[in-house]
Curated annotation (Swiss-Prot):
Protein name per Swiss-Prot or TrEMBL: Large ribosomal subunit protein uL14
CDD domains: Ribosomal_uL14
Highest classification ranks of the organism: Bacteria, Bacillati, Bacillota, Clostridia, Peptostreptococcales
Alphabetized HAMAP family for the sequence: Ribosomal_uL14 (MF_01367)
Species whose genome carries this gene: Alkaliphilus oremlandii (strain OhILAs) (Clostridium oremlandii (strain OhILAs))
Top-level taxon of the source organism: Bacteria
Length: 122
């Protein structure tokens, strides 16, 4: 569960390293974001020479959460860290590579480019 002020690692090569969640999109009083949800973030740390700079406000999609997620078949999935991928307004990733595994729920939410770039889909 990602909420306001949550910090996330960046799972792509856009240049950002850490994000701070500012807002969870999808409703006026929505509190939590889960895997596949879009959030508005501020870049807290970035690598020099990257596409994204520190202090920039970006949209990102959550790809890994430490909270357990229940699937339709009754199984649960849980990751070691909270991570997100920075996206543009047309839901395409800013970076050209994705690091680490991503959840299968992204395919249901139509983030096909992220799923195809990921080295492993769990």
């Amino acid at each position: 569960m990602i909420q306001q002020e949550s910090r996330l690692k960046v799972a792509d090569n856009s240049g950002a390293k850490e994000l701070l969640c500012i807002r969870v999109l999808g409703g006026t009083r929505r509190k939590y974001a889960h895997i596949g949800d879009v959030i508005v973030c501020s870049v807290k740390s970035a690598t020099p020479g990257g596409v994204v700079k520190k202090g920039q406000v970006v949209k990102a999609v959550v790809v890994r959460t430490t909270n357990t997620t229940r699937r339709k078949d009754g199984s649960y999935i849980k990751f070691d860290e909270n991570a997100a991928v920075i996206i543009k307004d047309d839901k395409q990733p800013t970076g050209t590579r994705i690091f680490g595994p991503v959840a299968r729920e992204l395919r249901d939410k139509n983030f096909m480019k992220i799923v195809s770039l990921a080295p492993e889909v769990l």
